[in-house]
């Protein structure tokens, strides 16, 4: 998100962290709008609801995007079908069926021309105005972050590389210049940890013994433990329409190559695509009807716990707050998910545990955390985040059925998560109360009083004494540069959130659904491109079952 302090008036000094409400109030401004931002906001009066985000520019600007009105409702989409040279695009259910008569996309005639400016970002904005779905993939990749590791590298060294370059995944080459890489991510790190703890079994006895005896294990062996999709590749000359058909099927990332498809130029992930769309939302006028629609109107996410999800919907997977953390990690591995909701006995959402949080238990000194409750682990994560960044606000991982798609996108970008939990507030919300409730939760801060931790560690289910006592190279030598969480010293050094404060600020309602990056990209692909039949569960079915 760019310049969050400029989004809402009276946001305070530039040194203060912007609240999430400020970040969610509207998409980021375009570069050439900054100079006229104050005038635009004075003219609009900022009276609109947070849940309804107008994307049209002020008439006083140097250029304008016409608001989607009745004149555009009858327009037919003339999306081009996917390029036949798109490589693996057809492997994941991308359809070439023409998309017409949706009423959600307008022709290019309603968009005024933007003069070409000198800076690269402003030149890119001009391309957005013409048509967003035909933007070439070369505009989206970060070539400076293209990093590979050899399959012979140890897991701990690969993990250190992830931390060093702030990556969530990294391609693993079997041989130099390998164009069919597997990727190492935090799901693989979780599998490695579970193997060390003897919570899962694999057919390779040598790898199992090395893991449990603390010997280095090649990352090339570990990446094979977690079922993965094929390494999809697209040339950088392809466009957004094509890649949406792939990422909208549940594939998490796509390699972007040179036009000849002989060299990988970068990696485009679901999360980066969503951030790109949100950062440039003001340029994508045809998306306005979708962005201002609610999740329940768009029919994405599971919104009724009394009926089973359809074949195109994600299941709501949760764990009780009093269950041990090790069970949450095992459940994420078994279900092949990257985060899990933590609920109380009544089904109310009390928190979120992500597979990236496994980095907090990669040291042998942190083993006791594995046997403490999920509720306790959430408080430890929040405390650690406060020590590292100075932030005292709760991250918000939930939305409501009435939340707009724009608000959902903004929260996904702000939290850098792959999914948000849909909750039903304790009282049936109206259009006004829902926005008010969400605002009060989003701006909530914590000022916890020190509370000693007295929970004792107990062996994880299925973990042998040998597994608990060995010193894995990863668990003993990895230094991620962050605050080290040591349960042995928590009783005197750690500030833990009091239960009553924790529940007041973070418990927001009954868990009734989940909306993921795949759901949203799939929606955009079906409504705005030629990929009208793309199935969001295709990639999950391809991956098959995980290691038991």
Swiss-Prot record:
SUPFAM superfamilies: CBS-domain pair
UniProt keyword terms in alphabetical order: CBS domain, Cytoplasm, Nucleus, Repeat
Gene Ontology CC: cytoplasm; nucleus
Matches recorded under InterPro entries: AMPK_gamma/SDS23_families (IPR050511), CBS_dom (IPR000644), CBS_dom_sf (IPR046342), Ssd23 (IPR016711)
Biased composition (Low complexity): 63-89, 430-467
GO molecular function, one term: protein serine/threonine phosphatase inhibitor activity
Main location: cytoplasm
Any one Gene Ontology BP term: regulation of mitotic metaphase/anaphase transition
Polar residues bias (residue ranges): 90-100
Domain annotation CBS: ranges: 140-198, 225-283, 310-369, 454-533
Keyword Ligase: no
Region annotation Disordered: where it falls in the sequence: 31-109, 426-471, 529-548
The keyword Nucleus is annotated on this UniProt entry: yes
Source organism superkingdom: Eukaryota
Composition-biased stretches (Basic residues): 34-44
Pfam families the UniProt entry points to: CBS
Protein location: Cytoplasm; Nucleus
PROSITE patterns for this protein: CBS
Family: Belongs to the SDS23 family.
Function: Involved in DNA replication and cell separation.
Name of the protein in its database record: Protein SDS23
Species of the source: Candida glabrata (strain ATCC 2001 / BCRC 20586 / JCM 3761 / NBRC 0622 / NRRL Y-65 / CBS 138) (Yeast)
Lineage of origin: Eukaryota, Fungi, Dikarya, Ascomycota, Saccharomycotina
């Amino acid at each position: 998100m760019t310049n969050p302090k400029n989004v809402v008036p009276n946001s305070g000094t530039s040194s203060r962290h912007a609240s999430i409400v400020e970040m969610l109030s509207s998409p980021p401004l375009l570069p050439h709008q900054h100079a006229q931002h104050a005038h635009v906001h004075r003219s609009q009066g900022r009276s609109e609801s947070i849940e309804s985000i107008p994307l049209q520019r002020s008439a006083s600007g140097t250029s304008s995007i016409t608001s989607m009105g009745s004149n555009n409702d009858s327009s037919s989409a003339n999306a081009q079908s996917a390029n036949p040279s798109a490589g693996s695009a057809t492997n994941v259910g991308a359809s070439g069926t023409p998309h017409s008569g949706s009423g959600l996309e307008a022709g290019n005639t309603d968009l005024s021309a933007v003069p070409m400016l000198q800076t690269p970002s402003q030149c890119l904005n001009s391309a957005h105005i013409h048509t967003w779905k035909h933007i070439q993939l070369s505009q989206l990749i970060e070539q400076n972050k293209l990093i590979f590791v050899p399959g012979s590298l140890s897991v701990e060294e690969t993990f250190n590389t992830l931390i060093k370059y702030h990556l969530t995944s990294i391609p693993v080459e079997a041989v130099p210049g390998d164009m069919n890489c597997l990727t190492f991510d935090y799901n693989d790190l979780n599998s490695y940890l579970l193997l060390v703890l003897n919570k899962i079994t694999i057919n390779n006895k040598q790898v199992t013994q090395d893991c449990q005896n603390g010997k280095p294990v090649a990352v090339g062996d570990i990446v094979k433990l977690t079922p993965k999709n094929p390494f999809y590749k697209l040339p950088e000359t392809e466009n957004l329409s094509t890649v949406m058909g792939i990422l909208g099927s549940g594939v998490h990332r796509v390699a972007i190559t040179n036009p000849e498809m002989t060299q990988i130029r970068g990696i485009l992930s679901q999360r980066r695509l969503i951030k790109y769309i949100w950062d440039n939302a003001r340029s994508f006028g045809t998306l306005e009807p979708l962005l201002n629609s609610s999740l329940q109107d768009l029919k994405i996410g599971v919104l009724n716990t009394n009926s089973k999800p359809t074949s195109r919907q994600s299941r709501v997977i949760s764990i009780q707050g009093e269950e041990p953390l090790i069970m949450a990690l095992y459940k994420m591995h078994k279900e092949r998910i990257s985060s899990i909701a933590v609920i109380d006995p009544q089904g109310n959402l009390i928190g979120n545990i992500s597979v990236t949080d496994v980095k907090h238990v990669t040291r042998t000194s942190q083993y006791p955390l594995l046997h403490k409750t999920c509720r306790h682990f959430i408080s430890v994560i929040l405390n650690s985040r406060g020590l590292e960044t100075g932030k005292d606000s709760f991250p918000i991982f939930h939305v409501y059925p009435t939340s707009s798609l724009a608000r959902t996108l903004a929260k996904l970008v702000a939290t850098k998560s792959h999914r948000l939990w849909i909750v039903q507030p304790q009282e049936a919300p109206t259009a006004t109360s829902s926005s008010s409730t969400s605002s009060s939760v989003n701006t909530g801060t914590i000022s916890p009083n020190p509370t000693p931790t007295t929970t004792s560690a107990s062996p994880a289910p299925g973990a042998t004494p040998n597994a608990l006592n060995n010193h894995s190279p990863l668990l003993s030598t990895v230094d991620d540069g962050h605050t080290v969480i040591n349960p042995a010293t928590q009783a005197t050094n750690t500030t833990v959130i009091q239960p009553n404060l924790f529940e007041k600020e973070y418990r927001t309602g009954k868990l009734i659904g989940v909306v993921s990056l795949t759901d949203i990209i799939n929606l955009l692909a079906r409504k705005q491109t030629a990929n009208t039949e793309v199935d969001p569960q295709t990639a999950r079915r391809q991956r098959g079952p995980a290691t038991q």
